[in-house]
Amino acid sequence: EPNLEPEYGRTSIVPAAMELPGADLYISLAAHPGRPEVLTNWMDPSVVSEDDPLSVDPTLDPFDEEREIPFTKEFVDTYRQAQRRRNDRITQWARTEIDRVVAAGHHDRLFTTPRLWADLRMIDGSIDPNNREFPSCYLGEPQRANYGIYGVGTVSSLRTWLSMWSLSDSQCNAAPHLARIKIPALVIEADGDSGVFPSDTRAIVDALGSTDLTTHTLEGDHYLRDREGARDDAADLITNWVKDRY
């Protein structure tokens, strides 16, 4: 049955969302455990001001020339906590800003979120190890990408942020929903992924409520582009798995 809550500022759910048909099978391919989690894990918590993409708290800067790699456990723990605090700060601002915009007779507005390519796992290959190249991210060299203008979540509306990226408000976190999935499930990871890591895949596997659960690791990067035949292998794997059940 539906498991949704009205978004911020609304009292009801969009009716069409309640009419979506249930699935027969669950398949995830190089999937992360939800948009709020992946964006938070990627974001740079050393940003001091959201209005200044060059502002840096040096105690949290993963690209500081004096920062030793591999990172210390203390730094990793502090960094992860700071990432979640940054997400929460943006969420609190977005709620307040929605109230201000609505009070002025409008519905929404756009804003930018800088520096979203700074997952420590993109820099330090000893954290959550797999066969990925490092330092690397989906846009190449992490520091260059982090200070660039391209990236998932870089431009949002206030309502998009709360609906899609906010740790506290978004319903796009996978964990609360995965336990409700009892149908047969196939979880595939790419062993050279530089943005979705082994612990992300384990989180999905551990959260699923399916008893018929198959996991598989493919050789290749996130988009299965680097190795010839990788996408064919994925298609064959999925096809055979589905045929075994229908």
Give each language-model segment a name.
Residues 40-44, 183, 197-206:
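Short alpha-helix in the alpha/beta-hydrolase fold that links the catalytic acid
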Residues 11-137:
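Alpha/beta-hydrolase-fold enzymes
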Residues 36-38, 170, 194-200:
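Conserved alpha/beta-hydrolase "acid-adjacent" motif
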Residues 237-245:
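C-terminal alpha-helix
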Residues 11-14, 159-177:
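Active-site nucleophile elbow and catalytic-triad environment of alpha/beta-hydrolase enzymes
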Residues 191-193, 219-222:
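Acidic beta-to-alpha connecting loop that harbors the catalytic carboxylate
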